[in-house]
Amino acid sequence: MFLNNTQARVSIGVLLLGNLLGGCATPKHALPEVQDNRVYAAAAEINAAPDPIARAVSDEEAVARISALYNKLKPAGTAVCRYVGEHHCDWELTYSPEEEVNAYASDAGTVVIYKGIVQYARSDAEIAMVIAHEMAHHIANHIRESQNSQAVGALVGGVAMALLLGDAAMYNSQVISDGMQIGAYAGALTFSRKQEMEADYLSAYIISRAGFDLDAGRGILVSLGRMGGRTTSTVLDTHPAGPERVAAWDLASAEIRAGSPMPRKR
C-alpha cells in the first residue's frame, strides 16, 4: 500500500497514538522490571552464542515429542490458568510440519507448534518453554485483547482520516479504508510486545511447576535472539528483542526460586 503525503501524516499520527495507548495498556501481572545493564549483559551473551543448528527430525518423532511435553505441561498450565481466573483452561495441541521456527496460539483454543521448533531446540525444556508460552497467551486472554485493540485502532484510523479530509472524505472511501487498516495495525502493536513479555513470565511458572529446569528453558530465547539479530525494540516491532526477553526471563526465574508459587498479580 503506497501512501501520499496526507496519508503518511495520518499514518504517523495513528502509530504514535497506538504507542501512547500501549503505554496505558498494562498486563494483568506484575512483570519484572528489566534494567538496562541486564539487557546489555543478555545482548553480549546472545552475540557470543553459537549460531543455532537444526537437526534432522521426522514428523513422527516431532509429534511424539511435543505431545509428550504438552501432556506433562498440561496440569501445570491448568493450575496457573485457574489461579489467574480464566474459565477456559482446556486447549488443543496442533502440529505443523513446516520447518519454520514458529508457534502461535489461535482463537480456536489451539496451541500450534511448528516442526522447526523441535529441529532447533537443544532440550525438552526449550520446547516446553515454547508450548507453555502459547498456553500463556490463552491464559492471559491475549487473543481477545488483540482483536479488541485492532478494532479500536481501525476506528481511530478511519476517524482520523475522515477528520483530516473533511468533506473530501465523502468522495475518497479508499483513503478512509487505508486509514482503518493503518489504525488496526497500530492497535495490534499497542498490546503485542507486552503480551509477549507476559506470556514469557507465565510460561516460566508453568515449566517450573511441571518440573523443567528454568535455565535450560531459557536456551530457546538465546537461540531466537541469535536468529533475530535485534538488540532493542522499536515502535513497529510486534515482539520484544531477544536481550529483553532473556533478561526478563532471568528475573522471573529468580522470583520463582525465591519461593513465589504463582505469578504475581497487579
Predicted regions and their residues:
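Bacterial N-terminal signal peptides that target proteins for export
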Residues: M1-I12
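Hydrophobic (often cysteine-bearing) scaffold residues that line and stabilize catalytic clefts
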Residues: G13, A62, Q195-E198
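C-terminal motif of bacterial Sec signal peptides marking the signal peptidase cleavage site
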Residues: L20-G23
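Peri-catalytic and regulatory segments of divalent metal-dependent proteins
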Residues: A25-V152, D167, Y205, R209-A210, ...
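DG-centered beta-turn motif at the end of beta-strands
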Residues: H133-E134, A199, A241
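Post-HEXXH active-site segment of zinc metalloproteases
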Residues: I143-S177, R218-L221
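Metalloprotease/metallohydrolase-associated module, dominated by Zn2+-dependent proteases
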Residues: A168-A216
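Long, well-structured alpha-helical subdomains associated
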Residues: D213-R257, M262
